[in-house]
Amino acid sequence: MLDEEGRELPRGSTGRLAVTGPTGCRYLDDERQRDYVQHGWNVTGDLYRVDEDGYFWFVARADDMIVSAGYNIAGPEVEWALLAHAAVRECAVVAAQDPERGTVVKACVVLAPGKAASPELVKELQDFVKQRIAPYKYPRVIEFMDALPKTATGKLQRKALRT
């Protein structure tokens, strides 16, 4: 587990998963070398937490991590909380620009059949998330959508939601 400067982190910390060894990932004469090989480590792009027993726990893809007012918020954790609500059929969480906090959590929500978007439902979903995970992680922006953008193979296109 590494921090942003490539220093190893102690157990209990969340950081970038990286591996090193006699073999590994090399991009000779390729710009990707700078992104994926740093300080002698092959950086995976995943964030993990190592518990006190040495077990690794997936937190999020590094590009799915949202930093809001100095807090690190894993988008998938917010998604799991939202998906537990009966009104939510599908959702995706991304960062949205905010003048005060830098970024905030934005949830793009596809409602379950028979459910209707309303300001009351926005508040209900926000309160629901606050009861399940740390309150500072709740989505400050909720956008209701008919469908989430996906590729032909069904993979979510988060980039399209960040605009």
Question: Which residues make up each language-model segment?
Answer:
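AMP-binding/adenylate-forming catalytic core of the ANL superfamily
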Residues: E8, A18-G21, C25-R26, D35, ...
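General small-molecule cofactor/ligand-binding pocket signal
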Residues: I142-M145
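Short beta-strand-to-turn element immediately C-terminal to the catalytic PLP-Schiff-base lysine
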Residues: L2-D3, T20
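Noncatalytic, basic helical substrate-engagement surface that gates or grips nucleic-acid strands
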Residues: E31
